Amino acid sequence: MKYSKILLCFGALWASSAFPAPAPCDTLRVAFLTDIHVTPGNVQDSLFRVAVDEINASPCDIVIFGGDLTNLGSDAELESVHGLISRLEKPWHAVPGNHETTWSESACTTFARIFGHDGRTAFRAGDYLFLGYASGPFMKMAMGAVRTEDLAWLAAEA
């Protein structure tokens, strides 16, 4: 799953390099969270609740989740973590990790219903374009992959 986070970061950097650099005084404060593995009632659930409060109190402008929001990708976990994320008072965006796609009991359909996209998201924040997509493995504990259709999507969005 670490490869998908790296790809997300490089994708965002690549996309932003195609546009003029903002003036030196322009800033965008991003909170980036990944692999939070929230399960209702576990320690990650409690820690994430604290993190949401800290982010709300911070000066960050946007929150990005890089995948593995849940531990098992169950419908109950996805509903729970979405409820917690919805407490954020900042704009936020999330892409699924392998725990939401490969390990999921719904094969990512619950993620798509709750989060509003099938694993690809493009958005602007300030002068920046962010492109996020799921690059997780298609079986448990395998290496991530960038699919041909993902590259075509990146090119079309950028």
Residue ranges and their predicted role:
Residues 6, 29-31, 139:
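Preference for short coil/turn "hinge" residues that link or interrupt alpha-helices
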Residues 75-158:
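Extended active-site neighborhood of metal-dependent phosphoesterases/phosphodiesterases
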Residues 18-80:
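N-terminal active-site segment of His-dependent metallophosphoesterases
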Residues 5, 20, 34, 39, ...:
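Generic hydrophobic/packing signal
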Residues 1-2:
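N-terminal secretory signal peptides that target proteins for export/translocation
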Residues 5-16:
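Bacterial N-terminal signal peptides
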